[in-house]
Amino acid sequence: MLVLGIETSCDETSAAIVEDGRKILSNVIYSQIDIHYQFGGVVPEIASRKHVEKISYVVDMAFKQAGLTIDDIDGIAATYGPGLVGSLLVGLSFAKALSYAKRLPFVAVNHIEGHIYANFITYPQLTPPLIVLVVSGGHTNLIILKDFEEYEVVGKTRDDAAGEAFDKIARYLGLGYPGGPAIDKIAKQGDEDKYKYPVADVGGYNFSFSGLKSAVINHVHGLWQRGEEFKIEDVAASFQKTVVSILVEKTINLSLETNIRKIAVAGGVAANSKLRSEFYKKCAEHNIEFFVPEFKYCTDNAAMIASCGYFKLQKGIVSSYRENAVPYINLVSKKS
């Protein structure tokens, strides 16, 4: 089965064609990072306008790279949320119109759920059950994936997502946008044990990064106010170590508690080198298999949406054309 995926939830316009949920035939991404860099973050109005300009071109390129036409496609999947509403509407409307015109089944995909499926692209033989940590700029979710389209969300952030904390600390330290890669890079030159930052105890498998973010900002502000010398590299490294330790510890604990000895990480923060190395290390210590997507599939892309769409269509799930963009939506537990 060939599925066309479309992703426009934030500032990447992407289209991909995936075969049987795991084999990528094309994956085209138009990134707006250079446009939004000067503003220190994504400007929603600009993002949606750029999606309108590029969506047709990106979809055409996906077909050209795959050597296919729309007549070869068996279904269409598109992100419906969460994300920026203007951006979401561009890809969702395009997908629904194309589906209607060509009488192809259409399926709306939750962006958070889509990130999970980046692992099934990188590891074609990977199968559930597994523990999944989805960690990105807007979301931090800990999930038990029991089967395709059957999962339990056992933990989520109570406030800021991990990626959001990275972006805000990077902005405060003057490291620019996007913040995650900037902190990852500069932290390599710092002493991660220089500062000890507090971690909020929210119990269970939930997360909280707002207090940590405030503690780092207040600490740096105090150093500046007192005129004390310090290295931004040390702050970045210490902050990063704290975030990573929280994410790794809770994910490992869930794996041990459930005796599901497979862990997969997904989302933009999955590209963080410290997070990847710590997971490899801790999983090896506990005899747990670890999976993480290739770097190019950690950030937003349509291949993961097409993959997720395939598994939905295989289960007979088809969306209505009344499905609308939903900018604020969580991932909720689902039984098949």
From Swiss-Prot:
The enzyme's E.C. designation: 2.3.1.234
Cofactor annotation: Fe(2+)
Keyword Acyltransferase belongs to the record: yes
Gene Ontology MF annotations: iron ion binding; N(6)-L-threonylcarbamoyladenine synthase activity
Binding of Fe cation, residues: H111, H115, D300
Biological-process GO terms, alphabetical: tRNA threonylcarbamoyladenosine modification
Catalytic reaction annotation: L-threonylcarbamoyladenylate + adenosine(37) in tRNA = N(6)-L-threonylcarbamoyladenosine(37) in tRNA + AMP + H(+)
Record keywords, A-Z: Acyltransferase, Cytoplasm, Iron, Metal-binding, Transferase, tRNA processing
Cellular localization per UniProt: Cytoplasm
Cofactor details (free text): Binds 1 Fe(2+) ion per subunit.
Origin superkingdom: Bacteria
Main location: cytoplasm
Residue numbers binding substrate: V134, V135, S136, G137, G138, D167, G180, D184, N272
The name this protein goes by in its record: tRNA N6-adenosine threonylcarbamoyltransferase
Organism of derivation: Caldicellulosiruptor bescii (strain ATCC BAA-1888 / DSM 6725 / KCTC 15123 / Z-1320)
Gene name per UniProt: tsaD
